[in-house]
A protein has these predicted regions:
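Conserved beta-strand edge residues that scaffold enzyme active sites
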Residues: 35-36, 191, 212-213
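Non-transmembrane alpha-helical segments in soluble domains
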Residues: 71-75, 96-99, 141-144, 148, ...
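Surface-exposed helix-capping loop/turn segments at secondary-structure junctions
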Residues: 80, 149-161, 202-209
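Short coil/turn segments at secondary-structure boundaries
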Residues: 111-112, 209-211
């Protein structure tokens, strides 16, 4: 098999790539990289991804990193439905607008809050200062409100009437914050309906990709983390 996906389904962009490949019926060989065990730090993996992150893809001996770039490549290299990344330049631009916006918004703010509330205490054994943590939470909430009030105000998907790669990336990022006890859908009806549409359009692979995250979310809730900031 010429296409290899290096991934860990606890990684938001890894889930997005996994879902896309499955939904589009693109054959690939999955190479699980266990982040918890530090497998991404192995010298062998550094030859695939110089910065030792996931996901990464190897296609016919050519290595690729960065999920947005990989998704664009897959849309151009394989015969996938046009709505994922339209050939029409204006429609394509709408997808690119979100992809560029996401870096410093959905990706940065959701991932930062998750890291500061869950990962940093796990790695250091020290809880985050509540006031500092609240600042991360506020930035994340503002991003979710922007999604609710701008990106999803008058359309079914982020960039139009049909699902695109932007929707998979965005939804996978947002799912992560459930693990730290935050419900992104609360008081956001547009976002709630959109996330359901994304899951339905990519079923059963969306659900499959989130099995582990959902299990960990339940475990964290039992431990009472949801009662923190």
């Amino acid at each position: 098999m010429s296409l290899k996906l290096y991934y860990d389904l606890l990684s938001q962009p890894s889930r997005a790539l996994y879902i896309f490949l499955k939904v589009c019926d693109i054959p690939f060989e999955g190479k699980f990289i266990n982040l918890a065990k530090g497998e991404h730090l192995n010298p062998e993996y550094q030859r695939i991804h110089p910065f030792q992150k996931v996901p990464a893809i190897e296609h016919n001996g050519f290595n690729m990193m960065e999920s947005v770039a990989i998704l664009r490549y897959l849309c151009r290299e394989f015969k996938v439905a046009d709505h994922w990344y339209p050939q029409d330049l204006k429609l394509q631009l709408k997808v690119d607008e979100y992809l560029e916006w996401q870096h410093l918004n959905t990706r940065l703010n959701c991932a930062s809050y998750f890291f500061m509330k869950y990962m940093k205490p796990l790695l250091t054994g020290k809880s985050m200062n509540p006031e500092s943590l609240m600042q991360y939470k506020k930035r994340m909430m503002q991003t979710l409100d922007d999604l609710e009030n701008f990106w999803l105000k008058d359309k079914n998907f982020l960039t139009g009437s049909e699902i695109s790669i932007a929707d998979i990336l965005g939804s996978c990022e947002i799912e992560q914050v459930r693990m730290v006890g935050y419900n992104p859908e609360e008081n956001r009806p547009h976002l709630t309906a959109w996330m359901k549409r994304v899951a339905d359009k990519t079923s059963p692979y969306y659900q499959e990709a989130h099995v582990l995250l959902n299990k960990l979310t339940s475990k964290v809730k039992q431990e009472g983390l949801k009662n923190a900031v």
